[in-house]
Amino acid sequence: VVLLWGSNARETHPIFFHHVLKGIRRGARLYAIDPRHTPTAAWAEGWLPLQVGTDIPLANGVAHVILRDGLENRAFIERATSGFAAYRDHILANYPLDRVARETGVPATTIEAMARDYARADRAMIAWTLGITEHHNAVDNVLSLINLALLTGHVGRWGSGLNPLRGQNNVQGGGDMGALPHKLVGFQDVEDPVARAKFEKLWGAPIPPKAGWHLTDMFRAMERGELTSLYVIGENPAQSEADGKHATHLLEHLEHLVVQDIFLTKTAELADVVLPATASFAEAEGTVTNSERRVQRVRRAVAPPPG
């Protein structure tokens, strides 16, 4: 059983979906959870057209069915989880199926069918994309799906699990290589003195002992006046942030803004200094890591211009 939650993988992750189709032809069941009847939903045994923003009630409604029908994996829960009693009581008290169906717009019978198939499957996976992560409550959306996997024991074993399908090219590779404010290469903690010392020796440079800011934290720091200068590389926050008007206001009031990009973006138009980057995808050596964690070598096509 595969639950594709907020993911139109047929179009956005075609290689991944090719393997899903192979599974369907061997008898696997696909459920598509999406407000739109996408090309992915066309292949699904069940389509759950939830109202936008009701992912958590729907996930908790699925949990309600599993708990009500006694389909939870008790052995796994006792061995590998904590807080189950409080979770069970909250779900059973607050997410009765009639309420969930009313809030989400998904028929109760469809929710029950998916919940039972997922819980009873020998192997089951939940995969999601930006459909649930580009929300103000994105973390809670994902946690509600993780709870389903923990409830049924569909995690930590072959053929089952949780699979976030990344939203942009090489997001996984960037994370692997430490392009995160709180992690070093290989997702080693930047605040771990042993890991930090190892990389300081390799790189021959000191590393700050505290984690940096995520993008959201950067904008909060701008509001507080703690962040006064910004160097933006290949990003367009004036247009990509959820509240573009507010983001633009904060960017305009920085003391110094530098933007490096191959295009004159909306953010670049606000900059004090614009560095016209070259087409690095054609001029760089490196690697790209895809959603199945396959690392591909990238060789440059042309040498960068001198200077």
Write out the residue ranges for each language-model feature.
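Cofactor-pocket helix-loop regions in the catalytic cores of large enzyme subunits
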Residues: 1-170, 176-177, 189-307
